[in-house]
Amino acid sequence: MVSKIRVLGGTPLRGEVTVRGAKNLVPKAMVAALLSAEQSKLRNVPLIRDVDVVSDLLRMHGVTVDYDQEAGVLAMTPGSINLPEDSVEMDTLAGSSRIPILFAGPLLHSLGEAFIPDLGGCHIGSRPVNFHLRVLEDFGARRIQEAAGMHLIAEKPLKAKPVHLPYPSVGATEQTLLAAVRAEGIT
């Protein structure tokens, strides 16, 4: 890797550069498509691995995903949302991303249950999902630890409530937003 770059000025830059969308936002916006029965479209979608992983996970849950990579347009149409029957394929996808935990809130709203496989995808150290689970439990979900992951059940519609995290967590905040959007009450 280059340790420094030297930039020499004096010549105006000309031309055009196409910049694709925010790589950290798009996978979460894709998960949010589970919150509606209507088609969701994202434009300016970047060509990143997480888009492929989330597309595959959405398809496994019954969502039709059409991605025009050249145009950068991604259309997601929820059909009959369901829990995947193939936990092996889901495990394979989960091993390359931490996104599956964010499916929990939307699936609890749509199905009353969610299965979250053991998660991978992090090279910066341990990043437990206990804050995610606490938010979902505070909203009324119940969790059952299974050999392959976590089964979450909401026997009644989720109920929003104030959330206080012990310290800032981007993922738990995203989970809170995805779970609270259709929950009864105010978060």
Indicate where each model-derived feature is located.
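Structural preference for solvent-exposed beta-strand-turn elements
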Residues: 1-187
